[in-house]
Regions:
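DNA-contacting surface of Y-family translesion DNA polymerases
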Residues: 8, 103, 229, 239-410
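A glycine-rich phosphate-binding loop feature that marks nucleotide/adenosyl-phosphate handling sites
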Residues: 184-187, 276-279, 335-347, 409-422, ...
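Short, well-ordered secondary-structure micro-motifs
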Residues: 191-192, 351-354, 425-428
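Short clusters of hydrophobic/aromatic residues that line enzyme substrate/ligand-binding pockets
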Residues: 209-212, 227, 299, 380, ...
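Gly/Gly-Pro- and Ser/Thr-rich, intrinsically disordered tail segments characteristic of DNA damage-repair
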Residues: 1-276, 282-286, 445-502
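Short, charged/polar surface micro-motifs in flexible loops or helix N-caps
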Residues: 12-14, 38-42, 345-350, 420-424
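Acidic, metal-coordinating catalytic segment for phosphate/diphosphate chemistry
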Residues: 18, 369-502
Length: 502
């Protein structure tokens, strides 16, 4: 089998770089963070420029952490400054390096998600100048995988030179630089980009390109720590491995030779993927990814509230989410026969003494290790496949009332339309044989069905008109009364993409 060559490209601090370029600033020399300061200092930072990261600031920290770290860095600068005094501020890294009397400053840029998507589209068009779309997988808004095996001979270039050529074209077109990883499979090119490239010096344009094959991976990364640096190894997997004496990928590879059953006992069928990656193997190709069709599909909507909600207000938000989810189904020509609801409770239910005293249910830990009441989760089957707002809203409201503890504050919710499929493929209710009996008035049943069909047809026309208005005039051009009630979030979320300002 022909050995393949893959390139992974990650745009450097993408959102922050876009904001710098739009201000006429150099992303490599400007202290800038993308965050919505209007949400308080606890808001998550979407991106941080490399110069600001150099002060020990995480790329995905909270805004208050950025401010705190800059304050600490300025204390150190003041201690080292002439006369122990800082005079003036700057958000330019080069100026701060040249003048120790300046205090570190930084720009807070509110996110503009729609604009970042436009930038990403422009960059994708650059990729298409070199690589066909069937050989590109878009991993995220700022990251892609490319199978360049059949292009190297065409361009008479090495993988390194081709990656550099593409990145420099992106830089010239948009002013945004990138990091690349090259590997003999998708896992290796990703790891080369995520781990190896971070430890090599950047060139004058801020570009880093690293390469890995299976043997080089084993030589250089079998001893690398922490395990969470590796693609698809999260904190939970790493913790289990460490509890069983495995702290590196080399340890995992050794265990797969000596005691493979232990890995399967710990991780089930996912152990196969972990073992492959420990040896630097990855059989999946871009061609296979493009050809993949899931056996079942779903459509979902999730939301984390800005503050704890009483259950009744939370139910309003769930209804709003369901309403928009159904419109999404209609827009895509899909139907569903099952709704799933997950509701997560707030930490205040256990930190407030009065609320804690009233709660005697199960407890679980949130991602930060804090105890919270166990989340509510349930599903409800619909009467056949449908995209009726009336039917689905009624079902989800019943499900909410059934599973949610009315004494607990709610913080997050997740609504899923399960088993979705194209409306044309949905089984019809009258398909198959029907058992007749002497006691049913079939004429009345038929008339009842006609009334129901007419109501559904009228509802479908309303849905179509609503979608047409929203597409032409904006998502908030038409709202329901519930969207104007206290605690409703749909109006604000309609002005967002991915939970951030559009």
């Amino acid at each position: 089998m022909k050995q393949r060559t893959y390139i992974a490209i990650d745009l450097k601090s993408f959102y922050a770089s876009v904001e710098c370029r739009e201000r006429g600033l150099d992303p490599l020399d400007t202290n800038l963070v993308v965050a919505d300061e209007s949400r308080t200092d606890k808001t998550i930072c979407l991106a941080v420029t490399p110069s600001l990261k150099s002060y020990g600031i995480s790329g995905r920290g909270r805004l208050f952490e950025v401010k705190q770290r800059v304050k600490e860095a300025n204390v150190g600068r003041q201690h080292d400054a002439p006369g122990h005094r800082l005079d003036g501020t700057s958000h330019f890294f080069s100026e701060l390096q040249a003048n120790p009397s300046l205090a570190i400053d930084f720009i807070i840029a509110p996110p503009r998600m729609a604009y970042y998507m436009e930038y990403s589209t422009r960059i994708y068009q650059v990729y298409l100048k070199y690589i066909a779309p069937e050989d590109i997988v878009v991993y995220s808004i700022d990251e892609v995988f490319m199978d360049v095996t059949d292009y190297l001979n065409t361009y008479k270039l090495s993988a390194h030179d081709l990656a550099m050529k593409i990145i420099l074209d992106v830089l010239e077109t948009t002013g945004i630089t990138a990091t690349a990883g090259i590997g003999t499979n998708l896992f290796l090119c990703k790891v080369a980009m995520d781990i190896v490239a971070k430890h090599i010096p950047a060139d004058k344009n801020g570009v880093r390109i690293a390469e890995l094959d299976e043997m080089k991976f084993r030589r250089e990364l079998w001893t690398h720590q922490p395990l969470t640096d590796f693609w698809r190894v999260g904190r939970g997997i790493a913790k289990k491995l460490e509890q069983n004496g495995m702290f590196t990928m080399g340890d995992v590879a050794l265990c797969s030779e000596r005691n493979e059953d232990l890995l399967y006992k710990l991780f089930g069928k996912n152990a196969e993927l972990l073992i492959d990656h420990a040896w630097g193997w990855e059989p999946t190709t871009i061609e296979a990814i493009k050809a993949y069709r899931p056996s079942s599909n779903s459509l979902s909507s999730g939301q984390v509230l800005h503050c704890p909600y009483e259950p009744q207000k939370a139910k309003l938000v769930v209804r709003e989410m369901t309403d928009l989810l159904v419109l999404d189904l209609v827009d895509k020509g899909l139907v569903t026969d099952q709704m799933v609801l997950t509701v997560g409770y707030d930490i205040e239910n256990l930190t407030d003494p009065a609320r804690r005293a009233r709660y005697h249910g199960a407890v679980e830990k949130d991602p930060y290790g804090r105890e919270i009441p166990k989340q509510a989760h349930g599903s409800i089957n619909l009467d056949g496949h449908t995209s009726s707002t009336r039917k689905i809203m009624c079902a989800v409201s019943k499900l909410f009332d059934r599973i949610v503890d009315k004494n607990l504050l709610v913080r997050r919710m997740y609504v899923v339309a399960n088993h979705v499929l194209p409306e044309a493929d949905a089984p019809k209710k009258n398909d198959g044989a029907v058992q007749l009996d002497l006691f049913t008035d079939y004429a009345a049943e038929e008339e009842k069905q006609k009334v129901e069909d007419a109501a559904l047809e009228r509802e479908r026309k309303i849905q179509a008109a609503t979608l047409a208005i929203k597409k032409k005039y904006g998502k908030n051009a038409i709202l329901k009364a519930m969207n104007l009630e206290e605690g409703a979030t749909a109006k604000d979320r309609n002005a967002q993409i991915g939970g951030h300002k559009a």
